[in-house]
Amino acid sequence: FEDDWSDVPACDVVFASRCLEVDDLKTALGKLLSKTEKSLYITFKVGGSFVDEEILGAIGRKVEQKPDFVYLLNILFQMGYLPSLSYIKSPCSAGPATSAEEFVQKTRWGLGGELSSAEEARLAEYFNSGKCAPKQEFMHWAFVWVDKTDKF
């Protein structure tokens, strides 16, 4: 979203799926809406983190929860739009980890690629302790859409 969008054409419909974990959500939404003629469709996570609190506790890490879809709705409303909302319930298709190595890899992905060697060791120990059980079978996503003609 930091790139120059001057060459990006405006379109009737714009989709932004799972890409709005940005520092300045209002600016990103402004860019998307500037290229939207009719409708903007967005998927955004429900909840503040991709990693379970118990796993974070096992590695001794506090993660600053990022705003979830409610923040997105509030910004759109402040911008004068009346966003619509629905939910998508999607199975966690990756399934539970079958090895400590896979568990570490999945946790690393959920934390944006950053794990120290000490955290990796604690994760492996946690996995091998047998205490590690998948908490949720589904991931919930907010499906938000804006009709650009529906402003107040």
Give each language-model segment a name:
Residues 2-5, 9-27, 44-46:
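A short SAM/SAH-binding and catalytic strip from SAM-dependent methyltransferases
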Residues 6-12, 33-34, 136-138:
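Flexible, charged surface loops at secondary-structure boundaries
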Residues 28-36:
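Class I S-adenosylmethionine-dependent transferase superfamily signal
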Residues 36-51:
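Conserved beta-strand signature within the Rossmann-like core of class I S-adenosyl-L-methionine
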Residues 40, 82-84:
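Hydrophobic anchor at the start of a short beta-strand
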Residues 49-56, 74, 95-96:
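Short, charged, surface-exposed secondary-structure boundary motifs
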Residues 55-77, 84-152:
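Conserved Class I S-adenosyl-L-methionine
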